[in-house]
Amino acid sequence: MTTQLEQAWELAKQRFAAVGIDVEEALRQLDRLPVSMHCWQGDDVSGFENPEGSLTGGIQATGNYPGKARNASELRTDLEQAMRLIPGPKRLNLHAIYLESDTPVSRDQIKPEHFKNWVEWAKANQLGLDFNPSCFSHPLSADGFTLSHADDSIRQFWIDHCKASRRVSAYFGEQLGTPSVMNIWIPDGMKDITVDRLAPRQRLLAALDEVISEKLNPAHHIDAVESKLFGIGAESYTVGSNEFYMGYATSRQTALCLDAGHFHPTEVISDKISAAMLYVPQLLLHVSRPVRWDSDHVVLLDDETQAIASEIVRHDLFDRVHIGLDFFDASINRIAAWVIGTRNMKKALLRALLEPTAELRKLEAAGDYTARLALLEEQKSLPWQAVWEMYCQRHDTPTGSEWLESVRAYEKAILSQRG
C-alpha cells in the first residue's frame, strides 16, 4: 500500500466518522452486493447460434470497434480480463444464444449440457450465473411476435424455449449454490396503429402461465419478467408493457425486471423501486443508460445510477434486489465498456453506503428540508474516492484509471490479432 493511499484512507475514515459513518462497515456491506455483468457486451449480442446473423427484436448495437469475441473461448477470456479490473463480487448474465454445441440445437431443445462449459468456468472463477431465453434474432420471431404469437405452433415453440431455459437456469443455481435469476423479455409489438391490443396480451398471459407451470426450487431459480415502452419496429404497441408485467409479477409473485432504458425518457426506475417492492417479492434491475431512447449506452456514475444505488441501500433491499447491467456499445473497446460500467455501478453503491441516511431521515421526519438538502449536497464533497481506492487495493484491482493500461496492453496483444 502506498503511503499516499494510506494517508488518504486515514483522512477519509476520520471525515466519514465525523458524520457517523463507519467506512469499514461500508466496505463489508459493499461485498454483499454482487453486480451481474452481461456477456453480450463482448460480442454485440451475436451469440454462438448464428454469429453472422442480424440482430433483431428492435434493439441495436452500433459501431464496429475491432476485436469482438468470436467464440465462447474468446468471450470467456475477455470476461476474465475485464473482471480482473473490477473489485468485489460479480456474477455473469448469459443469454440462451450463448450455448455451446458441436451440432445445431433448436432453441426449444436447449439443455443444461449445452452450458456445462459456462458452469465449470463460473466455478473456477467463483461466479454466480444468471440466464435469459433469447426471443429474438430467429426466423420464428421475424414477424415481431413470440410468446404472444397468434399462430399456436409458433407460440408453443417460444413457450417450450422458455421452459427449457428455466431448466438451464435451475441447473446453474444447483451447480453454483446461488440462485440464477432468469429474465423473460420479448420484443412482441407492432409498428403502427394496432386495433386489437387485448388478444396478444391474453395470449401472452396464458403463455407465461404455461412457462412457469413447472415448479422449480427457488434456491436454484428465480423467474423475472421485463417490460418495455417500445422498440425499433414496434413503436406503436408493445404487448409486454409496464402495466402488463407489473400486474403479472404481482399476481404470480415473480420478480419484476426494471430496465433503465425501457420507459419514457422522463421516467426513471429509481422512483419505481420502492413502489414495486410493496407488491412483488423481488426486483431485477437492468442498469443502463438510455440516450433519447433505449440506446444501451455504457453506464455512467450519473444522477440516475446513483439514485438507483441509493434506493437499494436506503431501504436495505440487499436480499430482494438483483443488480444487473444491460448495455452494448460496439463503438469502443468492449472490455473497457464492461470495466467502466461495472466499476461505476459499484462506485454508486459505495457512495450510497457512505451516506448518513439515519441523520437524513431524522431531518426529513422533522420537516427540516433545508438541512436535508444541505447535507445531501455536502456529502458529495466527502472523500469517497479514497475509500473506493482502498476497496480496489484490497481486491487487488487497479485504482484510478490505471486499469486502462491493462486494457490497452490486452488489446495490443490479443484483440488486435482477431480478424
Swiss-Prot record:
- List its EC numbers: 5.3.1.14
Any Gene Ontology biological process:
rhamnose catabolic process
Q: What cofactor is this protein dependent on?
A: Mn(2+)
> Binding of Mn(2+): at which residues?
H262, D294, D296
Pathway field: Carbohydrate degradation; L-rhamnose degradation; glycerone phosphate from L-rhamnose: step 1/3
**Compartments reported by the entry:** Cytoplasm
Q: Does the keyword Cytoplasm apply?
A: yes
Q: What is its main location?
A: cytoplasm
Q: Spell out the coiled coil positions from the record.
A: none
Q: Which GO cellular component term is one of those annotated? A: cytoplasm
Q: Which reaction does it catalyse?
A: L-rhamnopyranose = L-rhamnulose
Q: List the disulfide bonds.
A: none
How are cofactors bound according to the entry's free-text note?
Binds 1 Mn(2+) ion per subunit.
GO molecular function (one):
L-rhamnose isomerase activity
Q: Which UniProt keywords are present, listed alphabetically?
A: Cytoplasm, Isomerase, Manganese, Metal-binding, Rhamnose metabolism
Q: Which InterPro entries match?
A: L-rhamnose_isomerase, Rhamnose_isomerase, Xyl_isomerase-like_sf
Cite the record's note on assembly.
Homotetramer.
User: Which protein family is named in the record?
Assistant: Belongs to the rhamnose isomerase family.
According to its UniProt entry, the function of this protein is described as:
Catalyzes the interconversion of L-rhamnose and L-rhamnulose.
Q: What name has this protein been given in UniProt?
A: L-rhamnose isomerase
Q: Which organism is it from?
A: Escherichia coli (strain 55989 / EAEC)
